Design a protein with these regions (language model features):
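Extracytoplasmic/periplasmic ligand-capture domains
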Residues: 7-10, 14-34, 76-78, 95-96, ...
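General beta-strand recognition
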Residues: 42, 83, 106, 159-161, ...
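Surface-exposed binding/hinge segments that line
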Residues: 108, 142-192, 216
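Mature extracytoplasmic/periplasmic domains
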Residues: 191, 353-372, 556-560
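Short aromatic-glycine motifs in intrinsically disordered, low-complexity regions
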Residues: 72-81, 140-141, 195-204, 364
Length: 585
């Protein structure tokens, strides 16, 4: 049983997947599935896979793709509860795994686990994974998972102890979930620090303990996996081979599963209801949806993305010399939010899988604030007044407001997707009504979410004024997610040139007040108090208009009706239990 500090888990709202109609059994299969008995499995991830090292990845699609190979100590299940993967059991105070003072957590590892190359998995690999990510020169994109960790110790080959700098009310961040799996020390030993990006073989074909191993990888195109002969569960995985093909768009992925049946699984179907509903009616496949904490938002760039700045473009500096010329004004940010009609957006573009929201932490219900709901009502005239009173006026009659020679002209970027382009068009219209000129840019999704350090078009580079994407917490406790807005000493948590733009604070917002409140939150044990502090952190983000939350989204994918075993998950990788997937019998 969990101790009382984890009662927050009981407050999570229900989430689940659609029930598929019973299809005809697949012919020529053994009565009982075994390892590699069910042939090939095909998937479309229209945001193509860029890298398979989750610590260098910046997009959900890459974390999912890596999760077939690399495993954490524990996954988070569809209800948000931790379940053992490489760990023997979930550590708690009751079983002695979590210390009474909450300053350490100890995992006992499963025995006789092998890497896919046949080498034994040990606690040394866990320790190395921490050392790899926290190395100051490693551009580790998920370092916030190790926030507050002071030491990771191999007590013996099958026991690892994690020590925190203060009581950790939610100690399950490090090494758990898709963002924090274990990598092999032997393979990555020479890939530490500045060398991390140079290890192309390790980063595209990691050796893992999971049900599959990489057979072929072509960046931004295709990944082919084959079953791992050393996987510890003797009759898994059931599919002999898995192919993840990239490219196209969400509607095309939906069509390939639901209309033509040529693909088994289509991920992230951000498709308008009017388009996807007729496909579902054909009865070939099923839409799987679940609700966690995913929020579509417009992020504000607090730094100047002007190309004329060269190496300082969108680069945070402690002295504020690269601050954004007009988005640094909170009145401008607030006016942009006031001008948006989130209800129209939700109704037209999302249907039952999306609700308007003013919070970046929109779920689970226990941590959802009600302090920002004024944004649910569009206020165009109020936005105009706010800009006028702040000195932003259209003095030359060209329809664009200006102040001190600076015009309100915004470059608004996002990934290529019909729903996102229609969202852009709506927002462009609403912003132009208040005197803000808006240019739209869309980038191929595999590039936008790819994290290529050589590309100027990745969302972590953020070379636009605002950008739009969806994100949310990866467990029912949002501590790791909320760490994404920490500034830290010398801006260490901010994505900037010195870390290859690979930290998690993409907006480049730096608030000592937020950092101090987060420290209090991280040290608070009582679940009700933690929930209130999580709301306060959300409110600081919302009321400073660090980003503009738009839609509280469900995760939506589709599977062909001959596929079973899927347990749709919004708190972790959708492929977290892929070893159990099989053909219907």
């Amino acid at each position: 049983l969990f101790s009382t500090i984890f009662i927050l888990a009981l407050l999570v709202g229900a989430c689940g997947s659609a029930d598929a109609p019973a299809p005809a059994a697949s012919p020529d299969l053994p009565a009982t599935p075994g390892r590699a008995t069910d042939g090939p499995l095909s998937m479309i991830y229209w945001q193509a896979i860029s890298v398979l090292n989750p610590y260098l990845a910046t997009g959900t699609k890459d974390w999912h793709a890596a999760s077939l190979v690399l495993e954490p100590l524990m996954w988070f299940d569809p209800d948000g509860f931790p379940v053992p993967a490489l760990a023997n059991e979930v550590p708690t105070i009751e079983n002695g795994g979590v210390s009474e003072d909450l300053t350490s957590i100890t995992y006992t590892l499963k025995e006789d686990v092998l890497w896919s190359d046949g080498n034994p998995f040990t606690a040394d690999d866990v320790v190395f994974t921490w050392e790899y990510c926290v190395n100051p020169e490693t551009p580790c994109s998920t370092i916030s998972n190790f926030e507050g960790v002071t030491n990771v110790e191999a007590v013996n080959p099958l026991t690892v102890r994690i020590t925190f700098d203060a009581p950790a009310a939610f100690p399950y961040g490090p090494f758990n979930g898709q963002l924090s799996p274990i990598i092999q020390k032997t393979q990555f030993a020479d890939c530490m620090g500045a060398k991390a990006q140079e290890c192309s073989e390790a980063n595209t074909a990691p050796i893992g303990t999971g049900p599959y191993k990489v057979k072929e990888f072509r960046a931004n195109d295709i990944v082919v996996y084959e079953s791992n002969p050393n996987f510890r569960i003797a009759d898994q995985p059931h599919f002999a081979e898995v192919t993840i093909k990239g490219g196209g768009d969400a509607a095309g992925a939906a069509r390939a599963v639901l209309e033509t049946g040529e693909v088994d699984w289509g991920w992230n179907l951000q498709v308008e209801p009017a388009i996807i509903n007729p496909m579902v009616e054909k009865g070939i496949g099923t839409v799987y949806s679940s609700r966690g904490g995913l929020v579509e938002r417009i992020s504000i760039n607090f730094t100047n993305p002007d190309p004329a700045l060269g190496d300082n473009r969108s680069n945070w500096t402690a002295d504020g010399s690269t601050a954004h010329p007009f988005l640094s004004d909170i009145n401008v940010r607030q006016a942009l939010s006031m001008a948006i009609d989130r209800s129209v957006m939700a109704k037209q573009l999302y249907g039952f899988v999306g609700d308007p929201t003013c919070n970046v932490v929109a779920g689970p219900p226990a941590v959802a604030s009600t302090a920002n709901n004024e944004c649910l009502v569009q206020d165009t005239e109020g936005a105009k007044r706010l800009l006028e009173e702040s000195g932003w006026v259209d003095s030359d009659g060209d329809g664009v407001r200006e102040k001190d020679g600076v015009e309100l002209r915004i470059l608004y970027a996002t990934a290529t997707n019909p729903v996102r382009q229609k969202t852009q068009a709506l927002v462009q219209q609403w912003w132009e009504e208040i005197g803000v000129a808006t240019d739209l840019k869309n980038v191929e999704a595999g590039v936008f979410f790819g994290g290529d350090p050589a590309s100027p078009d990745t969302f972590n580079k953020f070379f636009s004024d605002v950008q739009m994407f969806a994100n949310g917490p990866d467990s029912i406790d949002p501590q790791t997610y909320l760490a994404g807005w920490l500034c830290g000493p010398d801006g260490e948590n901010i994505a900037k040139a010195s870390n290859n733009f690979n930290a998690q604070n993409y907006e480049r917002w730096c608030s000592p007040e937020y950092d101090a409140l987060f420290a209090e939150y991280a040290a608070t044990k009582e679940p009700e108090a933690r929930a209130e502090l999580a709301k306060q952190l959300n409110d600081l983000i919302a009321q400073n208009y660090v980003n503009l939350p738009l839609i509280f989204r469900g995760d939506v994918s589709a599977g062909i009706n001959t596929l079973t075993g899927v347990r749709m998950n919004s708190w972790d990788s959708q492929l977290w239990n892929i070893g159990e997937w099989q053909r219907v019998r």
